Swiss-Prot record:
One of its GO terms (biological process) is response to oxidative stress. Belongs to the sulfiredoxin family. Contributes to oxidative stress resistance by reducing cysteine-sulfinic acid formed under exposure to oxidants in the peroxiredoxins PRDX1, PRDX2, PRDX3 and PRDX4. Does not act on PRDX5 or PRDX6. May catalyze the reduction in a multi-step process by acting both as a specific phosphotransferase and a thioltransferase. It comes from Homo sapiens. ATP binds at G98, C99, H100, R101. This is Sulfiredoxin-1. The keyword Translocase does not apply. The gene is SRXN1. The modification Phosphoserine is found at S32. Its EC number is 1.8.98.2. Widely expressed with highest levels in kidney, lung, spleen and thymus.
Amino acid sequence: MGLRAGGTLGRAGAGRGAPEGPGPSGGAQGGSIHSGRIAAVHNVPLSVLIRPLPSVLDPAKVQSLVDTIREDPDSVPPIDVLWIKGAQGGDYFYSFGGCHRYAAYQQLQRETIPAKLVQSTLSDLRVYLGASTPDLQ
């Protein structure tokens, strides 16, 4: 699976992350409601992620994640990324959560971040962005 916006998309270890079975949020234990049943984790280039909402960060939390990623990267859950195909086949990768993890990987100057890709539609994106939803090609 390739990315149009540059870089490559590699698997970061299928099955890594949340154990099987439903958790309190309806997804797998430790997973999100979006990606709870998705086992595959990919290394997604930070450069292709679209983050349309500004983050409010706790610097201490970011530093804690930086330390954890350095010591035991597998203990940090992957972020969820909405993967949307545009009208003309373009690939778009939207990330709304995981702002502290995203900032930690940026601070570490990593080129990629572990992510679960959630195949989504323009209608799904409209839930997040409303009238600001772009016309994806």
